[in-house]
Amino acid sequence: MERLNPADCVYIDESGIEESLCREYGRAQRGQKVLGERMGKKAQRLSIIAGLNQKELVAPFHFKGYCDTEVVNSWLENILLPCLKAGQTVIMDNASFHKSTRTKQLLENQGCKLLFLPTYSPDLNPIEQQWAILKARIRKLKTPQQPLEDAIAQVFKQYG
């Protein structure tokens, strides 16, 4: 196996966020309970997709619903590919919607290589840790009155 230059590696992944995302803790006087509102029903789901190149978030995007091949290819073509340079390696998990012929073709036409991580190995994808950090920041910013999309956009802006 050839050795990859970390500067040429772009890890991509997607993650979901429920509209009901809220803080997991609060403060109160000793002996008092912290009360907060939280929806009891299943909320709308938003998904986020991005690349990670040397700790820098690349081409972050959020949308309503779940990820599929069409969404991935549209994001690749319109948002990620303009950020990539020929010779870079795009690394992603083995999700079935990553494995279309079109996905491979888009990357090859850009002069990029495609590499799949082994099945069930999120620990090999550094963007997984970024999702945890991102969701914690979103959780801090999100208020019951504020749409989740606004909190996500605000956090993406902080990443530059």
Identify what each model region corresponds to.
Residues 27-30, 108, 132-135:
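Short, hinge-like loop/turn segments at secondary-structure boundaries
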Residues 6-9, 127-160:
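C-terminal anion-handling pockets and recognition modules
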Residues 33-40, 110-126:
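RNase H-like polynucleotidyl transferase catalytic core
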Residues 13-15, 50, 76, 93, ...:
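Generic structural signal for small/hydrophobic residues in well-ordered secondary structure
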Residues 71-114:
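RNase H-like DDE/DDD metal-dependent nuclease/strand-transfer catalytic core used by mobile genetic elements
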